[in-house]
Amino acid sequence: YKLGGLRSAKRVAAIAETAGQLLNGGGLAAFCQLEAAAAAHFYASTPAHLMMPAGEFVFGLGVIGPDPLVPEPKFTIKNGKTRVPNAPGLGVEIVEDALQRLTLHRVEVTEND
């Protein structure tokens, strides 16, 4: 999911499986609910025999502090496990005002680009 999105990560997973290699999710979403939700979806949709243990699910969320983008988490991590959110998208609701406030650079793409 950190390789350009979930679709790119799934491509890498297919390559790893063909090569007989393990995947290291490499994430530590101890702060970001959105990142942890993406990780949960990726790990749940990837065969377990391909995955190394994931940092997100070892340390849990909220270790660093509350997440301003998703202050009311829809899922939790306990003892290294979680249920994948089943709401639309990644299953978490983002606070739009916080997203605007935390955006560093915005690019607008139109049909003609």
Regions of interest found by a model, annotated:
Residues 89-113:
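Extended hydrophobic packing segments that form well-structured cores
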Residues 1-81, 85:
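Shared catalytic-loop signature of beta/alpha-barrel
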